[in-house]
Amino acid sequence: MKAKGYIGLITKGTPARGLAGATLGFFIGFAAVSLFGPTAKSLRGILGLSPLEVGLLVAAPSLSGSLLRIPFSAWVDTTGGRKPFLVLLFLSIAGMAGLFLTLHFYYPERMPRSFFPLILFLGVLCGCGIATFSVGISQVAYWYPKARHGTALGTYAGIGNLAPGIFTLLLPFALVSMGLAGSYLAWLAFLIAGTGLYAVVGRNAWYFQMVAQGVPVEEAKPASAARGQEIFPAGNLIESLLLSARIWKTWALVAVYFTTFGGFIALTAWLPVYWISFYAVTPVVAGTLAGAYSILTSLVRVGGGYLSDRLGGELTGILALCFMLVGALMMTLSGNFRLSVVAGIFLAIGMGVTNAAVFKLVAQEVPEAVGGAAGWVGGLGAFGGFAIPPILGTIVEIRGAGGYASGFVVFVGLAAISLLLVGVLRQKRARVFAAI
């Protein structure tokens, strides 16, 4: 499409194509959440890892995946999402290539314990793809009018969040048929093909395309607005981050999202270890159970958004966190396989619905700095995916095999604290309405 007044200026893409590209890129990158969970048993035996080190192993991808969210989201405001997406995916490819080559040439006979730091580093590199979440959120938001953000962003997050569950389901089968190195080679091929496809399909919104071709900002905005683009870079992300950081409600929501979304990432990585080590199931069964948890959590997030619109974010969050608390208590006290499966369902429902409720609350509780608050919540909240698994591993080290169950007391505590915080938010809001 040619822009008026600029000979040779061509803009490409549509909102639907922008959504498809961003969703594809996020799906490809976010799968790294499940990088080591299904394979931890094999690596633990070869490297001689303690439970704490297993926790660090499965959490490694989430370190970069959470900490890179804020800076790469800010980068979108200057260049559009395409370049940040490709950089993160190429870093993930580099990590996966290194992991495959290490396993291909050294696993299992020539892979002593001294390889553990290298494996962790490669896991952190692979996890860069997890940070594509914030990039895609911004890229999709620029393509769509505000009235369609709910549907567009819900589609983006819902489909992309399915990736870890699907890979957790598939990886154990790949291990049986292709071995450890072969499984990661297949994943590497998927990453390369998917990144290439994103490079073809992914498009920045019209405004960024025009600016990149030399159109002045003051002319690119009205030209893009004429085609339906409503959102433009405000240029005040730093100010928004600083302002939202001074509002206590921002940190309350960070804590809740740390519990539910960070907890979701942590459990997607940890549950295969839990099922194999505590109930002695096969890797295929463990992968199926962990994958089902991850997929269910992602799917109910969509319904959680609907409930939040109908019941309000606070009430939805309180009800969902009660589900999570019950599930965590059941996991902590249960030594029964079937009861633990039911508990996992409670956890999935509670976490998934609360994840949706939190972002309903961001705009409601911090209206003066929504962008900054969303950055803190999304970035630091996801850090739970890195912080929680080592804590679970430490509890196993201290308590032995029984620690796999009693470690869920961490989620009991987090759910209780989050319930208290959402309750305070609800009470404060009720007082405001009463004073009007």
Outline where the language-model segments fall.
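C-terminal membrane-cytosol helix-exit motif in multi-pass small-molecule transporters
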Residues: 189-223, 419-426
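C-terminal transmembrane helical hairpin of 12-TM major facilitator-type secondary transporters
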Residues: 308-358
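C-terminal ends and interior cores of transmembrane alpha-helices
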Residues: 90-111, 322-335
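Helix-loop-helix hairpin linking two adjacent transmembrane segments in secondary transporters
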Residues: 156-207
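Extracytoplasmic gate region of multi-pass secondary transporters
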Residues: 36-41, 247-300
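A membrane-interface helix-boundary motif in multi-pass transporters
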Residues: 176-189, 394-414
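Cytoplasmic helix-loop-helix junction between adjacent transmembrane helices
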Residues: 122-159
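Juxtamembrane intracellular "pre-TM" segments in multi-pass secondary transporters
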Residues: 1-13, 209-252
